[in-house]
């Protein structure tokens, strides 16, 4: 029992630490798109911060507010996205690299999701799911 509690605590704290600092700004039902909701979040990356591989239960549009991010979807080459630029991810994309391109400056993203109501926007992936 104690081992299970320790495992769950470590897994929970590890998952939260693996995606940058996420701040939810808004969630809103989309009445013209039954069963869907829109969500807006910011994600702050400390200098050199790397997120764990993940996917999203959503179509998402990502605008880089500050700094630069190196991003790579499974099957694609890495790309560097700078402040003022936008990229897109589909629900089937596996995001294998997401990291702040700078070791000295923070980076900040503004993320717009369109997703099924009630589903978590982000799913962290284990080794076998990448």
Language-model features, listed with the residues they occupy:
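Sec-dependent signal peptide recognition
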Residues: 1-7
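Hydrophobic h-region of N-terminal signal peptides that target proteins for export
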Residues: 8-17
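Double-stranded beta-helix
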Residues: 22-24, 29, 33-36, 100-130
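N-terminal targeting signals for Sec/Tat export/insertion, comprising classic cleavable signal peptides
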Residues: 26-59
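Short acidic-glycine-tyrosine-enriched beta hairpin
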Residues: 30-34, 45, 75-92
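Extracytoplasmic
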Residues: 35-40, 59, 76, 92, ...
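Histidine-centered metal-chelating micro-motifs
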Residues: 50-52, 70, 87, 91-100
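Glycine- and acidic-residue-biased ligand/ion/polar-headgroup-sensing regions
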Residues: 58-75, 83-85
């Amino acid at each position: 029992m104690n081992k299970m509690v320790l495992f769950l605590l470590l897994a929970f704290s590890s998952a939260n630490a693996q995606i940058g600092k996420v701040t939810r700004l808004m969630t809103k039902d989309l009445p013209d798109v039954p069963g869907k909701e829109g969500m807006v979040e910011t994600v702050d990356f400390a200098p050199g911060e790397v997120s764990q591989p993940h996917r999203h239960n959503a179509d998402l549009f990502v605008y880089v507010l500050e700094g630069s991010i190196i991003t790579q979807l499974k099957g694609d080459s890495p790309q560097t996205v700078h402040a003022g630029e936008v990229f897109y991810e589909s629900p089937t994309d596996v995001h294998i690299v997401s990291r702040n391109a700078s070791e000295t400056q923070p980076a900040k993203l503004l993320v717009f999701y369109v997703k099924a109501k009630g589903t978590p926007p982000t799913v962290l992936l284990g080794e076998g799911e990448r």
